[in-house]
Swiss-Prot record:
The keyword Phosphoprotein does not apply. Keywords: DNA-directed RNA polymerase, Nucleotidyltransferase, Transcription, Transferase. The RNAP catalytic core consists of 2 alpha, 1 beta, 1 beta' and 1 omega subunit. When a sigma factor is associated with the core the holoenzyme is formed, which can initiate transcription. NCBIfam families: PRK00392.6-2, rpoZ. This is DNA-directed RNA polymerase subunit omega. Belongs to the RNA polymerase subunit omega family. Promotes RNA polymerase assembly. Latches the N- and C-terminal regions of the beta' subunit thereby facilitating its interaction with the beta and alpha subunits. It comes from Campylobacter jejuni subsp. jejuni serotype O:2 (strain ATCC 700819 / NCTC 11168).
Length: 74
């Protein structure tokens, strides 16, 4: 990805209805899943990129939602 992380974070925040708490919750949960072996839904190397950055890109690209994370934990 060639976007600056600030731009990606702003887009991800917009996707979460500008709710910073919700965004941080989704990023943390998705980063935990990635740390536990989940495959990134965007083209990133987990070993070369921060897991939180990967999660932000996934949210910004509509690959991950809070509702989707809740469903996978049930």
């Amino acid at each position: 990805m060639d976007k600056r992380i600030e731009e990606v974070a702003a887009k991800a925040l917009e996707k979460m209805g500008n709710d910073r708490y919700r965004l941080s919750l989704v990023v943390a949960k998705r980063a935990e899943q990635l740390a536990n072996g989940a495959t990134p839904l965007v083209d990133f190397d987990k070993n070369k990129n921060k897991l939180a950055d990967i999660a932000l890109y996934e949210i910004a690209e509509n690959k991950i939602t809070l509702e989707g994370l809740v469903e996978t934990n049930r």
